[in-house]
Structures are given as C-alpha cells and as structure tokens.
Amino acid sequence: METTKNEMPSYAKAFFYKLSKYLDNKFYFYGSIQRNDYFPKSSDIDADLFTDNEQSTILKLQNFLGVKKYQFRRFVYKLHKTNKIVRGHKIKYIDADNNFITEISIYNEKDKDNVLIEHNSKNILPFYISFFLIILKTFYYNLGIISNTTYTYYKKILMNYMIEGEDVEFVGIDILEPAHYK
C-alpha cells in the first residue's frame, strides 16, 4: 500500500513525496486510490501514517500543512477484521488551488498490522459494489445531480452494510478550538 493502483495527479504525487521526506516516514494509501472507483482530481486520497510518537508527527504535520492543532480530530475505530479497537488522529487537508484533498490518519506503530489488514480488505470489491460506486461517483462528481448528503449516505450503505454487513464503528472527537484562536 506504499504504492497506489491508480496514478496520482502530479501535484498529489509531489505533495506526498515532499511530506514523506519531511516526516522521514512512509505513507500507506487506501480507499479509492487503490480501487476502480477512483476519480482523478475528484476523489480524495486517503493515507495512513504509523509512528512511535504521534504528538511529534502531529506537530510536524501542523508545520508542513500550515494548520492548527484543533484541526486534527481524535478518533476511536473498531476494526472488523481483527476485532481490535485502535485510536488515532485524522486531518483533512484541502488545497483548492490544486484541486487536491487528502485525509491523513496517524496511528501508533503498534497498531500498524491490524489497520493495514482492515484497509487492505476493501481494496478488492465485488463487481457490483464497484459498479454502483462508479455510477454514484459519476452522478456526484461529474454530473452534479446528487447532493453531498445523498452521495455520503449511499456510499456508506455500499461500503459498510453491503461489504461488512454492519456500520463501521468509528467515533471522531473534535479538538476544540482555543478561545484565543477565534
């Protein structure tokens, strides 16, 4: 998962290369960038980082991305494949000028094997799921005939209920914005 099935746009490739060098760490990519339902310059790129020092990595990400700590979300995630519970942090980074969106998840190194098992399990989808995801994304990204709410609702049904048979247990906790940032 250090490489991707689909070619990243050149800006995204350069972004991850520079950030990987800056952090002295590897990215592991998952989600649509690894599947047939990836839409270049529309789909976000999901990436995992594993580290022994999450707080240090978050500080480095803050510096590189030019974001505040409260923009990171803490989360708890129940992995279905290994029945483990992991904790981590997530940042959604948007560069509108380059039509680039990424979600980077930061986990402790000890959870790496379990998280990768979970994420690899959704790299190869049944044909009918891929087909419906491509139709859904075409309606949303290319034709603009469905709302973000509708898109998210049906994607959740396809990816969670039709693959896992249940909802993904993922709880995000926003880090509150300090009063002096307002």
Stretches found by the model and what they are:
Residues 1-18, 23, 34-42, 51-182:
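Catalytic core of pol beta-like nucleotidyltransferases
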Residues 30-32:
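Glycine-rich beta-strand-to-loop/alpha-helix junction loops that act as flexible
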Residues 44-46:
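Acidic Asp/Glu-based divalent-cation binding sites
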